[in-house]
């Protein structure tokens, strides 16, 4: 029993859901169809003269457009608008704010319009006078986040019918609209009602008579014996037939002319959009090329830095000791070349001048003996090393030993000041002849 009740409830729920979705789809289809008929009527009758609020066709079109923009609009919210009702104007005000040179701010500042419904109706008229209605709707539809926030899932603005609507509204740019925004029609208190009767009239074929003609022919058939066998066939002359054909062709021509203007306006809009997209594409292409060139420059700079760092690392790696050995040889050569003057002084001048003596304040010769031993060790190491052998112990980095050697060399006084060292405190000669090497500096 309970299972059957649950199944019945589910079936009723599914059927009600299907009925609801069908009703919403029918509402969308009816509104889009009647909007198409209304636009065609405006294009047919007012391509050569402006339209104002006195036109019944415009009043009906404004009502249709208001119903479309209000279709499946989310419920009233008292905190959002000043009159306690949230209408489509609140959606237009947010979604169309990105349109360049829009009329939203001017409508907001109108003193005689206070309610959201009145502002929405004023916006419809201003957008038609600006001939930018399709642009406003297209921009609003691009803001999908705001559209989902204001409309339910089955609304026209949330379905593909909205794209059809924007295409239909492009043709209105061929019409000149002229409205006065100060009137009772913009009070926003009375709801609008769509008049469907202009679009539901049955177009009777010319092969049959009207109701009055049928009555007249029926009455005449009862009184006259020479009545036609087929009372429903029209009794028209050739002139009436040609006039009716001409009138029908004229109507077709006007419709085709209106469609031609609509298609031309649509082509112009698409061309302008294509030009904008091409300009945007060129701008993005230039940005892409500039970014690629900058990336190449940065890549080359980074490659140069990497090569420089690799060269520095190669110089610091202890595997190749040739530069270090060459520097050690140069250092040994310089140290050896500095001592012959001291040897000449010790041998020649010491033999010729035996009266040289040391003063009491003579400096210790330990630094000189250390430097001499360093020179002899360097010569012995340089001569005893073969070309194939590495400098220093095998498998051991010689850099720390060289660092210590550099420190010891820096502490030894230079032989450049040897003459002053000899003349001031170290050596004194009693020979009357002065030697250039022993003269005071």
From Swiss-Prot:
**GO terms classed as biological process:** positive regulation of cGMP-mediated signaling
**Segments of skewed composition (Polar residues):** 367-379
Q: Which domain of life is it from?
A: Eukaryota
The task this protein performs is described as: May act as an effector of RAP2A in neuronal cells.
Gene it is expressed from: RUNDC3A
Q: How does it assemble?
A: Interacts with the GTP-bound form of RAP2A.
Region feature Disordered, mapped onto this chain: 211-234, 367-399
Do you know which SMART domains this protein is assigned to?
Answer: RUN
Q: In which family does this protein belong, per the annotation?
A: Belongs to the RUNDC3 family.
Q: Which residues carry this modification: Phosphothreonine?
A: 210
Protein source organism: Bos taurus
Query: Which CDD domains does the record match to this protein?
Result: RUN_RUNDC3A
Can you say what this protein is called? Answer: RUN domain-containing protein 3A
Locate the RUN domain: which residues? 52-184
**Keywords assigned by UniProt, alphabetized:** Coiled coil, Phosphoprotein
């Amino acid at each position: 029993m309970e299972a059957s009740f649950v199944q019945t409830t589910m079936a009723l729920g599914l059927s009600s859901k299907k009925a609801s979705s069908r009703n919403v789809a029918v509402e969308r289809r009816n509104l889009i169809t009647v909007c198409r008929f209304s636009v065609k009527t405006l294009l047919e009758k007012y391509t050569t003269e402006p339209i104002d609020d006195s036109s019944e066709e415009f009043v009906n079109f404004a009502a249709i457009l208001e119903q479309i923009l209000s279709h499946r609009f989310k419920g009233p919210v008292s905190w959002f608008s000043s009159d306690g009702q949230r209408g489509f104007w609140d959606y237009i005000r947010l979604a169309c704010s990105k349109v360049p040179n829009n009329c939203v701010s001017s409508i907001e500042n109108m003193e005689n319009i206070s309610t959201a419904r009145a502002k929405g109706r004023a916006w419809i008229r201003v957008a038609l006078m600006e001939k930018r209605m399709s642009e406003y709707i297209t921009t609003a539809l691009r803001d999908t986040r705001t559209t989902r926030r204001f409309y339910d899932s089955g609304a026209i603005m949330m379905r593909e019918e909205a794209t059809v609507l924007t295409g239909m509204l492009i043709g209105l740019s061929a019409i000149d609209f002229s409205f006065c925004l100060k009137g009772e029609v913009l009070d926003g208190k009375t709801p609008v009602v769509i008049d469907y009767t202009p679009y539901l009239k049955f177009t009777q074929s010319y092969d049959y008579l009207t109701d009055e003609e049928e009555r007249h022919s029926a009455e005449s058939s009862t009184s006259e014996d020479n009545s036609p066998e087929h009372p429903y066939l029209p009794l028209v002359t050739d002139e009436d037939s040609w006039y009716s054909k001409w009138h029908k062709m004229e109507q077709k021509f006007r419709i085709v002319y209106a469609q031609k203007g609509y298609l031309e306006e649509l082509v112009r809009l698409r061309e302008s959009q294509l030009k904008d997209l091409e300009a945007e594409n060129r701008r993005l292409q230039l940005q892409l090329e500039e970014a690629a060139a900058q990336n190449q420059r940065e890549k080359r700079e980074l490659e140069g830095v990497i090569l420089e760092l690799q060269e520095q690392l190669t110089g610091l790696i202890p595997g190749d000791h040739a530069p270090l050995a060459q520097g050690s040889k140069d250092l040994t050569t310089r140290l050896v070349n500095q001592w012959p003057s001291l040897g000449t002084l010790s041998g020649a001048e010491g033999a010729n001048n035996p009266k040289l003596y040391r003063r009491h304040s003579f400096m210790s010769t330990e630094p000189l003996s250390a430097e001499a031993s360093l020179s002899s060790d360097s010569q012995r190491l340089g001569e005893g090393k073969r070309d194939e052998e590495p400098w220093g112990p095998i498998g051991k980095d010689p850099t720390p030993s060289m660092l210590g050697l550099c420190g010891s060399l820096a502490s030894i006084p230079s032989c450049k000041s040897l003459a002053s060292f000899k003349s001031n405190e170290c050596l004194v000669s009693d020979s009357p002849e002065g030697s250039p090497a022993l003269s005071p500096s």
